[in-house]
């Protein structure tokens, strides 16, 4: 029986697929015993290989925090992946279309993002945790699937960059000691409408994010990171995207996607896509 591929070998395979803009069979198809601990070891190998070729970690994406989509994908718990300087687009660069031609089976997710202003810890309460957030913003993550038809197991998603393709962050709103308590309340239970070329495509509510809103996703991430000796701890200056507020919908070059937010003091966002 051949030896199971090493984390570095699997990392090379998924990075080759990423660079070649092609899809591959899920890791679990050839290795049914490939589990989440093994997948996060691959994720660490991917990070090291991406850093070796000049990319820099600038944040994290948390996926599958929206419980309403779990059955659709057969994944029933959150996962996370790194965000890189090559995949992040800040508000200062949102005036031009976002290229997606290098992504495979891309889908769009409206999300809430936080900027880390002080190092948070997993045992903090909501007040302490929000005090570590420098800003909050609304934006889009473009996710992708190296696996045809979006068919995979949870471990496959972790090995393949957490399905991350690109992160477009809207204009940040500072969180201050005077506004932190209000943000805790306002980020739970607000509504979002997702539109394609002006037509409503889906609706969501922030309470779908782990039942407690975006801050709950950050807390979950902190608990997972604390249990993983290979994972980099969250650092000041990182961006954390907390998971989709609606279903993840397929996108194509030439489309313009936008959102309307209600009951939260954040603007909607418009994002044009190009090849």
Predicted regions and their residues:
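Catalytic-core "active-site belt" of small-molecule-metabolizing enzymes
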Residues: 2-231, 256, 268-274
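Short strand-turn-strand beta-turns centered on an Asx-Gly dipeptide
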Residues: 196-198, 242, 262
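Conserved metal-binding segment of the jelly-roll/cupin
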Residues: 234-246, 251
């Amino acid at each position: 029986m051949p030896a199971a591929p090493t984390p570095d070998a699997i990392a090379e395979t998924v990075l080759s697929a990423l660079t070649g803009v092609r899809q591959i069979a899920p890791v679990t198809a050839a290795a049914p015993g490939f589990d989440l601990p093994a997948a996060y070891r691959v994720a660490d190998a991917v990070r090291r290989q991406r850093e070796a070729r000049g990319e820099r970690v600038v944040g994290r994406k948390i996926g599958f925090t929206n419980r309403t989509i779990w059955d659709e994908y057969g994944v029933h718990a959150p996962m996370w992946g790194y965000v890189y300087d090559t995949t992040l687009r800040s508000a200062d660069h949102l005036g031009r279309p976002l290229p997606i031609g290098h992504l495979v089976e891309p889908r769009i997710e409206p999300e809430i993002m936080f900027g880390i202003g002080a190092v948070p810890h997993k045992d903090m309460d909501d007040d302490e945790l929000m005090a570590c957030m420098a800003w909050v913003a609304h934006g889009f993550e473009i996710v992708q699937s190296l696996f045809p038809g979006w068919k995979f197991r949870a471990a496959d998603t972790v090995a393949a960059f957490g399905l991350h393709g690109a992160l477009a962050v809207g204009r940040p709103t500072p969180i201050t000691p005077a506004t932190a308590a209000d943000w805790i309340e306002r980020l739970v239970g607000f509504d979002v409408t997702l539109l394609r070329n002006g037509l409503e495509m889906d609706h969501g509510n922030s309470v779908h994010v782990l039942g407690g809103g975006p801050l709950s996703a950050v807390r979950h991430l902190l608990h997972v990171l604390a249990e993983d000796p290979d994972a980099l701890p969250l650092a000041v200056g990182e961006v954390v995207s907390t998971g989709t507020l609606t279903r993840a919908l397929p996108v194509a070059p030439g489309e313009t996607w936008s959102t309307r937010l209600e009951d939260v003091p954040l603007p909607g966002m418009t994002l044009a896509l190009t090849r």
